Amino acid sequence: MFANRVRQAQKLYQKRFFSLGNNSTISKQQFKNSSNNNNNKNGGNKNGFYQKAFIATTVALTTTLLTATTLLDDNTNSEKEILKSQRQTFEKYASTTLEGERQMTAEDFLSALTTLESDKQSGEHEILKASLDADKFKVLFQMADVDHTGYISFDEYVMFDELMAKPEAEYFLAFKLFDRDGNGYISKNDFKHVITASLDPSIPFNFDCELVNLYFGDGRTELNYSQFTQLLKDLQQERIKQEFKFHDKYNSGYIPRDKFAKVLGSVKLRKIPDHVRDKLESISELNLLSGHPNEVSYSQFVAANDMLLHIPSYGRVLKAAILKNKKDNINKEEFLTEARSSTSIEITPLEIDLIFHLFDLNKDGKLSISDFEKSTGLNINKIGGGTNYSDSYPSDSHVTIQNSSTTPSPSTPITNTAAAIALNKKHGKTFAQQVLESIENFALGSIAGGIGAAAVYPIDLVKTRMQNQRAVDPAKRLYVNSWDCFKKVVKFEGVRGLYKGILPQMVGVAPEKAIKLTVNDLLRDLFGDKSKGEIYFPLEVLAGGFAGMSQVCVTNPLEIVKIRLQVQSTGPKVSAITIIKELGLAGLYKGAGACLLRDIPFSAIYFPTYAKMKTILANEDGKLGPMDLLLAGAVAGIPAASLVTPADVIKTRLQVKANAGEQTYTGIRDCFQKILKEEGPRALFKGALARVFRSSPQFGVTLVSYELLQKALLPDAEYKPPTNAPITQKDFDVIRGNTNTVQRVIDMESKFGTLHQTRDNNKSSNGGENKN
């Protein structure tokens, strides 16, 4: 129902005004039908080879579909909450009933528009009402009253609210205000009329400038919506350029420093922290030797304008440069070098001079994070990618928050990335401290690995026995399937039989998981882009592959002992010590090649998938709960475990001692060829399902335990999860909830120049108050 309203709104506004874009959506029912159709196609051949061979892949796809369905349900719940809020607001202010349906009058609509989140803000409520003059309200009401009845129905209110929630709402409002005759185009006369009424008449705007002539030609060209939005962007630069010329009375290329600060402060395409705004006039100090101590040159004016547009980007550059140079502060050359290597922003030496002049508080020629944060009010740890940095400023700081992008977008929470975590590391740690930290992480990884292995060990035993079953004749097979194997082990060997060989497993899994997690972390940190908190995907896979390779030298000897203990069912039992003596040092590494073929691809698939799942499951604050981590680990284990099953089967066959009359193998190739010849390709996927059901929860439990143990046992230690993928989860509620329509109008006026100086002009005409 809600989605239908949105689509109706889009169609209505497309027809009435202009195209708002096409949103392609797939309903949940279509999604389910598609899934069912696929299942029906595959269901007719349940006993076929391909289904059995790739059964784990099917499980992985099913899990992916279930995850997608869950995400769709989450979005649906969010939409229901929004609709509920819209209904509550409408019912609160709608005072008229027509034909049995509640309706809003113009006064009701005005009250609804100017309502803030808190009813306690009644003073601001009245200010918003006062700021919405008759002309602007008329435009808004006409936009909402689609059927021209003079009243607003609930459906119309929802449509209007949906439109105002769009990121381009401010452009849309500006377009409607400029389009005086409502024909969907902006003429040069429309443009001149609004701009003339909006700007300060004491600084006339030259409508015969090159910019206006390029857009409107000889005056007969009219602009559609898209063309108009580009004009609004370019208009800002033209305004300040003309204002500079106006204040340059003697054509000297300099203007008074107070006029310089006023002109730059009048443009609302950026955020200007109060500390920076107050220091803009001090830029004139750089001209003491040139004979213009109280003036600012045009080159400085242009450089300062560019600099103010990119303050958050400079914060990222500073952070990356300090990490790269391993120093607490950097000089101009180091800053410029990092800026050119890590950003697409072209920074000039003059801009560098201005940056250090404004932000270098102690004037030592070096810039530190502390200097930057004190000068700007920015929290440098919260600076992420993109152009909207509202959350980078502390809530109690006195910072003028202005849109930093020419395309308006709702503020989104920006969470810490791996680079931000790395930035929090204390510089100058002693070697002993670093060693202690590594030991702590290793110990936690060992304990977590043991917990994960013990939780799923019975499944591992069943998997090993199924893979080792070599008889081709069904009559000679000891186990029909994994479930039959499980039942027979419990029946003939007892519950304790399910845990045969667990001691070597516990001894081996601790260093295995600890080494794997530690190496993966180390390589991700080495390969990653610290300035952005990101890692190139092929390098991410490479890090996982090396992590898997690093564990084999330690775990292969213990695993071969474990496997030989697991396959002992009846008859005389052989101890682990006896097995070790029998094999010798060389024998303990039997099957190591197959082990590498299994573990390297497994880790190369698992760790990037786990990192990606963490980003998907993170909440609006970028945080994950224990169940989120468990699910991320479990889902990542599905493709990783299933796709490397053939290597695991070969490894098991090579490491198990063949009984009398059973086939023996001389190596990986020999084993592979004999299995294909004697048992068929399906034998390469024996135990695939058990492996999936073992590996997925095992690694999920391991990683959850790792992170929870670190929080519980080392709460004051630096938090370092097994994978440090950056989390950038957008919050749907924030996108919808922090938007007030009247505030949109005010922001639009400030941004695009419409009615920008009107309030000051009114004050001047009403008694000359606040002439400054």
From Swiss-Prot:
| Record flagged with keyword Cell membrane | no
Location of the region described as C-terminal domain in the Swiss-Prot/TrEMBL record: 721-772
Q: What is its main location?
A: mitochondrion
Domain (EF-hand) ranges: 132-165, 166-201, 235-270, 347-382
Which CDD domains does the annotation name?
EFh (cd00051)
Q: Name one Pfam family in it.
A: EF-hand_6
GO MF terms, alphabetically ordered: calcium ion binding; identical protein binding; L-aspartate transmembrane transporter activity; L-glutamate transmembrane transporter activity
Q: Where does Ca(2+) 2 bind?
A: 179, 181, 183, 185, 190
Q: Which GO terms describe its cellular component?
A: mitochondrial inner membrane; mitochondrion
Look up and give the membrane topology term.
Multi-pass membrane protein
The region called Linker loop domain is annotated at 378-422
Disulfide bridge positions per record: none
Entry-linked Gene3D superfamilies: EF-hand, Mitochondrial carrier domain
What ranges does the record list as Low complexity composition bias?
763-772
Q: What family is this protein classified in?
A: Belongs to the mitochondrial carrier (TC 2.A.29) family.
Function recorded in the entry: Mitochondrial and calcium-binding carrier that catalyzes the calcium-dependent exchange of cytoplasmic glutamate with mitochondrial aspartate across the mitochondrial inner membrane.
Describe, as the record does, how this protein assembles with itself and its partners.
Homodimer (via N-terminus).
Q: What is this protein called?
A: Calcium-binding mitochondrial carrier protein
